[in-house]
């Protein structure tokens, strides 16, 4: 049968590769080598073979990837994709999602010796590219690849002394990722999704989202000429839905929770074979998100803060932030790692609840918070998130909607940063952590603002309050000032 001939050919290819590079295997039957290679080969041996194959021949490395049904493009800096549950390592092709053995989430692994050599030969200080792609050695992409047209990354890191004084923090920095093209950190993941989709020869991308991932995908895909199908809960703010429609996405509002939205998107992606941008399913999304950490480190001259505060929903962002810092540490660019502050809404905090209990077993929760971007009662990336919190000796903080609104006001009035609710949650967590003694007042802290307030104007007005409304009459103006107890400063000379 044709299928049988094809399988024998694959076995022969694998067997010959193993026999060529590993002495002493000529006495072992080819079918046995195939089984060992595909199912139970030790991770260290796999990595050694991958490196040997790459260094010996790009063609041989491509053969190794084709054995797993993936791209023949050899990424010099990537050694494979490792399952976070069973430990299986597979080649990092552009369309990989979850572990083929157990269904676990995959994590992209790197050759840090290669990264060190590459950066030594091309220092970051010599690079003109100010986008996330300036860190290409740390990303699963070819150096010669054409990247998306939108300027993703390079967002400002502000020294926020006035806000720090209000929060009681000696050294506070605000990383404003709301300055990305579609106004959120999620642009970093979506730019990576578009890049990998193009690499895989795909023309349509889909995802489920509470809003920001959806708008970022729609915008980045539009710039690359790709079509998008976006599934969002019907509760999504109109501003975010408007972005989707303006970018030309096919938008499906789902009457249900984020879990319901995720499920129907997964079924549709499977049915029509679209490229899957869902962050918990696609391991490359975290690789895009981690660039926020690479930027923070470089903007601070690679001198690490004591803490980095991150708002948490699905878990992919905090996991990406941690991986970025770990990658820098493994590459020798930083000498210590910061502790993470994991911030969730008290009305929806399954990851923090599990972290506080010291367990990897989380329990679904209701989505009772106005911070829609982190309203995820059934997180899809809990393993990586919980490991990030644990490995970083992280601080766990849950904040109420009222505390988030206060942080929105404080960011605006003392730092000039307009944050959506989820974007302000990290700063709300910093404030609460100081007040409760979880972090020291003399600590250095970076708080990541993940999204811009223009995405959710209704809740911005709710937090800031309504403006005065008067008839065009000076007496009415004075009455309005008086009713609000305003003391009006005069600039007129005496």
Tell me the role of every PLM-derived stretch.
Residues 5-10, 19-20, 66:
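Basic polycationic patches enriched in arginine
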Residues 27:
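Cationic, low-complexity basic patches in intrinsically disordered or flexible, solvent-exposed regions
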Residues 62-72:
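Short, Lys/Arg-enriched N-terminal segments with co-localized hydrophobic residues
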Residues 72-494:
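PLP-dependent amino-acid enzyme catalytic core
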């Amino acid at each position: 049968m044709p299928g049988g001939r094809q399988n024998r050919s694959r076995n022969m290819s694998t067997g010959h590769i193993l026999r060529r590079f590993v002495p002493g295997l000529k006495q072992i039957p080819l079918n046995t080598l195939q089984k060992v290679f595909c199912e139970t080969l030790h991770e260290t041996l796999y990595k050694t073979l991958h490196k040997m194959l790459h260094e010996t021949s790009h063609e041989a490395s491509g053969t190794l990837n084709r054995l797993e049904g993936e791209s023949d493009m050899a990424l010099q800096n990537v050694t494979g994709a490792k399952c976070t549950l069973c430990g299986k390592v597979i080649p990092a092709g552009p369309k990989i999602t979850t572990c083929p053995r157990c269904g676990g989430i995959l994590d992209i692994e790197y050759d840090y010796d290669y990264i060190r050599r590459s950066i030594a030969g091309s220092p970051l200080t010599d690079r003109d590219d100010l986008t996330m792609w300036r860190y290409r050695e740390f990303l699963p992409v070819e150096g010669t690849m054409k990247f998306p047209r939108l300027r993703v990354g390079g967002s400002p890191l502000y020294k926020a002394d006035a806000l720090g004084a209000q929060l009681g923090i000696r050294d506070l920095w605000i990383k404003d990722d709301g300055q990305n093209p579609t106004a959120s950190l999620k642009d970093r993941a979506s730019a990576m999704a578009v890049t990998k989709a193009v690499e895989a020869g795909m023309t349509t991308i889909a995802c489920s989202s509470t809003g920001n991932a959806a708008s970022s995908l729609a915008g980045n895909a539009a710039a690359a000429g790709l079509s998008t199908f976006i599934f969002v809960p019907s509760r999504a703010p109109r501003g975010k839905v408007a972005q989707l429609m303006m970018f030309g996405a096919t938008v499906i509002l789902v009457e249900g929770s984020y879990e319901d939205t995720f499920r129907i998107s997964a079924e549709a992606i499977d049915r029509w074979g679209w490229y899957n941008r869902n962050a918990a399913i696609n391991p490359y999304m975290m690789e895009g998100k981690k660039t926020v950490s690479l930027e923070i480190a470089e903007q601070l001259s690679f001198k690490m803060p004591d803490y980095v505060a991150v708002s948490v929903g699905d878990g992919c962002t905090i996991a990406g932030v941690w991986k970025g810092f770990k990658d820098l540490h493994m590459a020798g660019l930083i000498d210590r790692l910061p502790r993470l502050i994991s911030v969730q809404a008290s009305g929806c905090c399954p990851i923090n609840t599990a972290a506080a209990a010291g367990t990897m077993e989380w329990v679904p929760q209701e989505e009772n918070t106005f911070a829609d971007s982190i309203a995820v009662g059934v997180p899809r990336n809990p393993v990586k998130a919980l490991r990030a919190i644990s490995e970083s000796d992280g601080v766990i903080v849950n904040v109420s909607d009222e505390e988030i609104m206060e942080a929105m006001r404080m960011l605006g009035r003392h730092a000039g940063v307009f944050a959506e609710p989820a974007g302000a949650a990290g700063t709300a967590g910093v404030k609460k952590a100081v007040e409760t003694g979880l972090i020291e007042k003399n600590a250095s802290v970076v708080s990541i603002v993940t999204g811009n307030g223009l995405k959710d104007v209704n809740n911005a007005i709710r937090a800031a309050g309504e403006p005065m409304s008067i008839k065009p009459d000076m007496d009415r103006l004075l009455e309005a000032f008086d009713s609000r107890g305003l003391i009006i400063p005069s600039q007129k000379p005496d």
